[in-house]
């Protein structure tokens, strides 16, 4: 329990420094290498589909086994064990990184530098950012922070609570696969099919937990718990992903804004249903409000975890 709390605090303070050799970088290199290998040897769609399943097995196994073997190897040395465990837990969390990258877009908008805002946004979203209006930039930034509050914070924390650093790292490997391969366009619809589906499976519970927690903390940014729950449940299916709409709808309801709509991914126009209700016009401040919502959700989730552990410890 203490290791997780320390890892969260470290993430809040230093985040993911650009110079640091982050484990996800090496997971990404492995995925890229496997994709190249698959495309080199398999040209038929059915074999690319099968190879995508092979990538899932390899990446998830390695992501789990490396931290597991290392931690088992140093288990007798408690101080070293906890230092390494905290290190792995820290690397799966992304609150400070989300805050920092999301705020860069906000800062560019405050300076009225729309081109720089589009550029900064392009670093954190998969959609095409060229030509986006100010409102579309804000919407994309808010959606990304809300969605990644699940993928980058609540989900890894949940898996860390259930199975320690190895399971959290395994989740991170699966999530990285999805971000690199899980697109349902012409290029990735076969090799990315299984990476996308396994990510949907692993995010099924975390996304819903994130949505509920966001609703509970919504009054912190001026929202209403019951209204947020109502909108989340109403709009939970307004997304191509079975999971993303939960945190996005909760965040939209908390701020009284509308998300979703038309986006362009890799040159293809993707029509999405809208999420939330436009009670308030999108403004720069909604980026800040979503960041506050993200941190508040993480804190409440940790508090709930500590209460459960203390309760179980007494029984």
From Swiss-Prot:
Q: What is its main location?
A: membrane
Q: What GO molecular-function term can you cite, just one?
A: ABC-type vitamin B12 transporter activity
Q: How does it sit in the membrane?
A: Multi-pass membrane protein
Q: Name one GO biological process term.
A: cobalamin biosynthetic process
Query: What pathway, per the record?
Result: Cofactor biosynthesis; adenosylcobalamin biosynthesis
UniProt key word Ribonucleoprotein: no
Q: Where in the cell is it found?
A: Cell membrane
The protein's job, in short, is: Converts cobyric acid to cobinamide by the addition of aminopropanol on the F carboxylic group.
Q: Please give the name of this protein.
A: Cobalamin biosynthesis protein CobD
What does the record give as the organism's lineage?
Answer: Bacteria, Bacillati, Bacillota, Clostridia, Eubacteriales
């Amino acid at each position: 329990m203490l290791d997780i709390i320390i890892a969260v605090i470290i993430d809040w303070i230093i985040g993911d420094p650009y110079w640091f050799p982050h484990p996800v970088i090496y997971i990404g290199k492995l995925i890229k290498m496997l994709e190249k290998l698959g495309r080199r040897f398999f040209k038929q769609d059915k074999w690319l589909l099968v190879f995508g399943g092979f990538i899932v097995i390899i990446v998830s196994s390695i992501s789990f086994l490396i931290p597991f073997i290392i931690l088992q190897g140093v288990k007798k040395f408690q101080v070293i064990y906890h230092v390494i465990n905290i290190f792995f837990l820290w690397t799966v969390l992304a609150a400070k990184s989300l805050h920092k990258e999301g705020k860069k877009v906000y800062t560019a908008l405050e300076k009225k530098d729309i081109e720089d805002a589009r550029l900064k946004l392009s670093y954190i979203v998969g959609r095409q950012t060229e030509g986006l209006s100010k409102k579309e930039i804000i919407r994309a930034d808010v959606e990304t922070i809300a969605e990644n509050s699940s993928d980058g914070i609540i989900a890894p924390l949940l898996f860390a609570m259930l199975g320690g650093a190895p399971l959290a790292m395994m989740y991170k490997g699966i999530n990285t696969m999805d971000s690199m391969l899980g697109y349902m366009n012409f290029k990735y619809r076969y090799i990315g099919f299984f990476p996308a589906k396994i990510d949907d499976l692993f995010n099924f519970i975390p996304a819903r937990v994130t949505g509920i927690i966001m609703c509970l903390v919504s009054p912190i940014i001026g929202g209403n718990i019951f209204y947020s729950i109502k909108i989340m449940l109403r709009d939970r299916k307004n997304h191509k992903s079975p999971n993303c709409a939960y945190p996005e709808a909760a965040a939209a309801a908390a701020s009284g804004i509308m998300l979703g709509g038309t986006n362009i991914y890799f040159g293809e126009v993707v029509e999405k249903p809208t999420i939330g209700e436009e009670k308030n016009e999108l403004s720069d401040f909604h980026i800040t409000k979503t960041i506050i919502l993200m941190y508040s959700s993480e804190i409440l989730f940790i508090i709930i975890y500590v209460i459960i552990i203390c309760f179980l410890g007494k029984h």
